């Protein structure tokens, strides 16, 4: 992101995909409790979790979960989350530069905003379709409660895949693809384009060098913009994916039920943990991604020089 100078090593597509996958997995492991808190806040009010448990704020939700269901609950669904990043983030982030270059091929000028958005749309759309089953399982495991004699729907990650496919249908593993596609198209375009533009502005105007402080600031700004614009689609996606069979006939029905029963603010439930999670996830992921790309490219150049 931001074209390297002629003196810099151009990372290959394989290096970008691998770096994105590893960086995203690391970011997920560190920020996963925030994601679990976000999911619980987003589904609060629809009646599946006992009304005696109320989650208030980020720290309140994390503390309540730890006290009532145990610390491991904060990481329930992590294996599916890691699988999601391997199949999803590695593609949407790792392929972004390559697809952007394809749309800009034959032009001497830097990629236009249209090129960047087109690349974000394409990589985000493909990644969502491939990674959707992991998203469904992750959300289901994060949402299920063990309180007050409620029997868990799933005992683990692979049990969840099997139960969903056999008791609901194989296609249920792609449940919520539409709102998730909308959410991730927004995220991919806003996150990657904002990060790219912010980083380019800082580097090209010589405000910051293309190094860790620049990556930190760019990632933080991208995280805020992305969270604000993607929140409504994110809440609807979580509600629809976690819903029982027949609870919502369609995605629009889910959105309308939320609007009529809980009001427009329901679309921003879990905004604070969502922002904290996405901003911190972005910072960790982009910093690790940039450093991994550099180091792997240098290693590759060293190997090439010695052979």
From Swiss-Prot:
Organs and tissues of expression: Brown adipose tissue.
Topology in the lipid bilayer: Multi-pass membrane protein
Reactions that this protein is recorded to catalyse: H(+)(in) = H(+)(out)
Cysteine sulfenic acid (-SOH) PTM positions: 254
Record's protein name: Mitochondrial brown fat uncoupling protein 1
Modification after translation, per record: May undergo sulfenylation upon cold exposure. May increase the sensitivity of UCP1 thermogenic function to the activation by noradrenaline probably through structural effects. May undergo ubiquitin-mediated proteasomal degradation.
PROSITE patterns: SOLCAR
Topological region Mitochondrial intermembrane: 2-10, 97-116, 196-212, 290-307
Complexes and interactors: Most probably functions as a monomer. Binds one purine nucleotide per monomer. However, has also been suggested to function as a homodimer or a homotetramer. Tightly associates with cardiolipin in the mitochondrion inner membrane; may stabilize and regulate its activity.
Mitochondrial matrix side: 33-73, 134-178, 233-266
InterPro entries: Mit_carrier, Mito_Metabolite_Transporter, Mitochondrial_sb/sol_carrier, Mt_carrier_dom_sf
Compartment(s) where it occurs, according to its Swiss-Prot or TrEMBL record: Mitochondrion inner membrane
GO biological process: adaptive thermogenesis; cellular response to fatty acid; cellular response to hormone stimulus; cellular response to reactive oxygen species; mitochondrial transmembrane transport; proton transmembrane transport; regulation of reactive oxygen species biosynthetic process; response to nutrient levels
GO cellular component: mitochondrial inner membrane
Keywords, alphabetical: Ion channel, Ion transport, Membrane, Mitochondrion, Mitochondrion inner membrane, Oxidation, Repeat, Transmembrane, Transmembrane helix, Transport
Annotated positions binding fatty acid 16:0: 56, 269
């Amino acid at each position: 992101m931001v074209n390297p100078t002629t003196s810099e090593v151009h990372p290959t597509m394989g290096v970008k995909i691998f770096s994105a996958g590893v960086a995203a997995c690391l970011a997920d492991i560190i920020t996963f409790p925030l994601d679990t808190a976000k999911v619980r806040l987003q589904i609060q009010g629809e009646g599946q979790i006992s009304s005696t448990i109320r989650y208030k704020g980020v720290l309140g939700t994390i503390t309540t979960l730890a006290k009532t269901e145990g610390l491991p609950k904060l990481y329930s669904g992590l294996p599916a989350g890691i699988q999601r990043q391997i199949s999803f983030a590695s593609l949407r982030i790792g392929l972004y530069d390559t697809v952007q270059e394809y749309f800009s091929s034959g032009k001497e000028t830097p990629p236009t905003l249209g090129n960047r958005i087109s690349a974000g749309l394409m990589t985000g759309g493909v990644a969502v379709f491939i990674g959707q089953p992991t998203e469904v399982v992750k959300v289901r495991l994060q949402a299920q409660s063990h309180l007050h004699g409620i029997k868990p729907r799933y005992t683990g990650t692979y049990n969840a895949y099997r139960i969903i496919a056999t008791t609901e249908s194989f296609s249920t593993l792609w449940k919520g693809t539409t709102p998730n596609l909308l959410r991730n198209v927004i995220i991919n375009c806003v996150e990657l384009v904002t990060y790219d533009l912010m980083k380019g502005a800082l580097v090209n105007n010589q405000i910051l060098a293309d190094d860790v402080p620049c990556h930190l600031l760019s990632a933080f700004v991208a995280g805020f913009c992305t969270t604000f614009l993607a929140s409504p689609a994110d809440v609807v996606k979580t509600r629809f994916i976690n819903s029982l069979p027949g609870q919502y006939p369609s995605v629009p029905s889910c959105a309308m039920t939320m609007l009529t029963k809980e009001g427009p603010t329901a679309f921003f439930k879990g905004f604070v943990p969502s922002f904290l999670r996405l901003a911190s996830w972005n910072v960790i992921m982009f910093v690790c991604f940039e450093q991994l790309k550099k180091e792997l490219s240098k290693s590759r150049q060293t190997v090439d020089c010695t052979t």
